[in-house]
Swiss-Prot record:
Subunit structure: Heterodimer of LeuC and LeuD.
Pathway listed: Amino-acid biosynthesis; L-leucine biosynthesis; L-leucine from 3-methyl-2-oxobutanoate: step 2/4
Entry-linked Pfam families: Aconitase_C
Name this polypeptide is given: 3-isopropylmalate dehydratase small subunit 1
Keywords: Amino-acid biosynthesis, Branched-chain amino acid biosynthesis, Leucine biosynthesis, Lyase
Gene3D superfamilies named among the record's database cross-references: Aconitase, domain 4
Organism expressing this protein natively: Methanopyrus kandleri (strain AV19 / DSM 6324 / JCM 9639 / NBRC 100938)
């Protein structure tokens, strides 16, 4: 896991729910590659064809609201999304995504600072988001060390496999 993520931004609005991230009709599979073929289809039916490895989703408030389903962050990660940056996240989505190793960053005003396809740089530890096309830099909430450890391991399960009970020590 890199501290700094650079990619191409895809901008969505407020209240993107888990049904928009991965429509319910695809919940019959657990295969990440199959889920990736339908990621964000509920918000933009053409998105699965446009997204590339390393892209970053930018959105408004309450991203990941709705039903609690691990399929949503699994689909995003499998599609190559490197990070999701929003004004705010639904709490259960936030926990699921971090636990699965998908970086999430809270950044006020981020959805107003980007257009689809613009270059984006996200610094997870220092807490900033930069529009590489305009030069605009926004303050974001840096991720705490314990979350970075989860992300660096590839998720909570992988961290526990690697460190055992030490994973929960200060």
């Amino acid at each position: 896991m890199r501290d700094v993520i650079r990619g191409r931004a895809w901008v969505f609005g407020d209240d993107i729910d888990t049904d928009q991230i991965i429509p319910g009709r695809y919940l019959t599979t657990q295969d990440p590659e199959e889920l990736a073929k339908h990621v964000m289809e509920g918000a933009d039916p053409e998105f699965p064809e446009k997204v590339r490895e390393g892209d970053v989703i930018v959105a408004g408030k309450n991203f990941g609201c709705g039903s609690s389903r691990e399929h949503a962050p699994i689909a995003l990660k499998a599609a190559g999304i490197a990070c999701v940056v929003t004004r705010s996240f639904a709490r259960i989505f936030y926990r699921n995504a971090i636990n699965l190793g998908l970086p999430l960053v809270v950044c006020p005003g981020v959805d107003d600072a980007f257009e689809d396809g613009q270059g984006i740089e996200v610094n997870l530890r220092e807490g900033y988001v930069r529009n590489l096309d305009t030069g605009e830099e926004l303050e974001a909430k840096p991720l705490p060390d314990f979350m970075m450890r989860i992300l660096e391991a590839g998720g909570l399960v992988e961290l526990i496999k690697r460190e055992g009970p030490r994973a929960f020590e200060g």
